């Protein structure tokens, strides 16, 4: 939808906040604007604020809080000095216990409004570490000529700009406390203008940085990164092109993996692989999902969008057989290796694009008792429409987007005869508006 940012009245106005939007902004309806909705960053339900308009569109306006006139009792002082500028977090001003309450509300609203379904029971919200939890992410890097400095950080709320971060409390401390050193290192490079991003990922025993560079690094620049890695305990990878171009700079062998001790499983991964960002929540989520699936020793389970085997390999410790299917062939190769490394011969893996026709695939024709799926933000409707759903006793759906979960839940309940037994939010990304959730369906 087209938005106007320049030619409108930016005079601050006073308004009451009635709700919290799905992206963490306060919601107001302005009487002088005919009840038109305005989304206001930095505002909480129950507050009276002065806000400055930032954008207008036909159906809603946008604004930012400039003064809180009457504060919510749930408002707290943000821990981060960059809150309100950096887009990495949008909820630090809301009491931690209330953040997950808000996410539960977003989930239930989506299920009812989009899917036209209501769970028989609301699952207790699941939480893990709230600070220093983020073990995977991507920083933007930008040389600002006017300031004669390099910025390393997440995007600002205005995504045209990179936040100038001195610290980040949501990423693991080894990363969050060293952002200024990263910026200074890039600023001192010969190729300082050729680094658009730095990715980080942490295993249990190593933390890796992947440096995206548009031109070959000079020998001097490479040595600077090696010295930084040796001093601060990082592994450095270089990425001159696409994903396949990633290779180690120092050291040459990097043991990237994380353990799931409850199932005696160790999962190895590569620097750009997908892993769940919150290690403590991930372990709780796996316990939760397997319990909700009611996995039994004689079960055959299908695990769709299985990735490295995050759910598949723990399931293999519990059930007779599990089949994991994933669209990324590299992840499938790592999942197979992980099964072998962990001595699991009852886990099979297939590479398949689950947005395309898979009705003749070998794995599709096998019989299964239960289904677990953890799709991307786009959801799983395409593959759900192909599966022999009536053969599954129970489905556990792990979701990273409540809208696509709600759509798919509507299909399962209203068109395929399943019951939505329960659903609940999981706080994978505390202090952000991201809603992770889990839902359980049973065949009627």
UniProtKB/Swiss-Prot annotation:
The keyword Heme appears for this protein: no
Catalytic residues in the record: 400
Molecular function GO terms recorded: 4 iron, 4 sulfur cluster binding; iron ion binding; RNA binding; rRNA (uridine-C5-)-methyltransferase activity
Reactions catalysed: uridine(1939) in 23S rRNA + S-adenosyl-L-methionine = 5-methyluridine(1939) in 23S rRNA + S-adenosyl-L-homocysteine + H(+)
Every TRAM domain range: 5-67
InterPro entries: 23S_rRNA_MeTrfase_RlmD, MeTrfase_TrmA_AS, MeTrfase_TrmA_CS, NA-bd_OB-fold, SAM-dependent_MTases_sf, TRAM_dom, U5_MeTrfase_fam
Pfam families: tRNA_U5-meth_tr (PF05958)
Residues that hold [4Fe-4S] cluster according to the record: 80, 86, 89, 168
UniProt keyword list: 4Fe-4S, Iron, Iron-sulfur, Metal-binding, Methyltransferase, rRNA processing, S-adenosyl-L-methionine, Transferase
Domain of life: Bacteria
NCBIfam families named among the record's database cross-references: PRK13168.1, rumA
Family classification: Belongs to the class I-like SAM-binding methyltransferase superfamily. RNA M5U methyltransferase family. RlmD subfamily.
Primary role: Catalyzes the formation of 5-methyl-uridine at position 1939 (m5U1939) in 23S rRNA.
Protein name: 23S rRNA (uracil(1939)-C(5))-methyltransferase RlmD
Gene name linked to the record: rlmD
């Amino acid at each position: 939808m087209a938005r106007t940012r320049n030619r409108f009245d930016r005079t601050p106005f006073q308004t009451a906040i009635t709700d919290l939007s799905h992206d963490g902004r306060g919601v107001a309806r302005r009487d002088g604007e005919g009840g038109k909705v305005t989304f206001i960053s930095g505002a909480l339900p129950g507050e009276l604020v002065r806000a400055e308009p930032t954008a207008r569109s036909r159906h809603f306006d946008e604004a930012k809080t400039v003064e809180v006139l009457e504060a919510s009792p749930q408002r707290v002082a943000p821990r981060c000095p960059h809150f309100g500028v950096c887009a990495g977090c949008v909820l630090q001003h809301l009491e931690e216990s209330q953040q997950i309450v808000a996410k539960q509300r977003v989930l239930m609203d989506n299920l009812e409004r989009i899917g036209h379904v209501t769970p028989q029971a609301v699952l207790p919200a699941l939480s893990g570490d709230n600070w220093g939890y983020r073990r995977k992410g991507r920083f933007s890097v930008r040389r600002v000529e006017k300031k004669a400095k390099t910025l390393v950080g997440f995007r600002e709320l205005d995504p045209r700009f990179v936040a100038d971060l001195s610290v980040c409390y949501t990423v693991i401390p080894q990363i969050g406390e060293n952002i200024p050193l990263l910026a200074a290192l890039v600023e001192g490079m010969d190729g300082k203008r050729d680094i658009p991003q730095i990715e980080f990922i942490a295993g249990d025993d190593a933390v890796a940085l992947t440096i995206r560079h548009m031109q070959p690094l000079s020998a001097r620049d490479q040595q600077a990164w090696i010295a930084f890695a040796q001093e601060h305990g990082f592994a450095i990878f270089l990425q001159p092109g696409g994903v396949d171009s990633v290779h180690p700079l120092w050291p040459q062998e990097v043991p990237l993996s994380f353990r799931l001790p409850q199932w005696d499983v160790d999962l190895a991964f590569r620097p750009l692989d997908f892993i769940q960002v919150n290690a403590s929540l991930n372990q709780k989520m796996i316990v939760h999902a397997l319990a909700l699936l009611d996995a039994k020793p004689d079960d055959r389970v299908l695990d769709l969008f299985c990735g490295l085997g995050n759910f598949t390999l723990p399931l293999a410790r519990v059930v007779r057989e599990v089949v994991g299917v994933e669209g990324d062939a590299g992840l499938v190769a790592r999942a197979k290796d992980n099964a072998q490394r962990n001595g699991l011969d009852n886990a099979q893996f297939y590479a398949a694009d689950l947005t395309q026709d898979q009705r003749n695939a070998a794995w599709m024709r096998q019989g299964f008792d239960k289904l677990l799926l953890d799709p991307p933000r786009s959801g799983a409707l395409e593959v759900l429409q192909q599966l022999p759903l009536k053969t599954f006793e129970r489905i556990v759906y792990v979701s990273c987007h409540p809208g696509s979960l709600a759509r798919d839940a509507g299909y399962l309940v209203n068109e395929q005869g399943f019951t939505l037994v329960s659903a609940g939010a999981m706080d994978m990304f505390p202090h952000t508006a991201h809603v992770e959730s889990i839902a359980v369906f049973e065949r009627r």
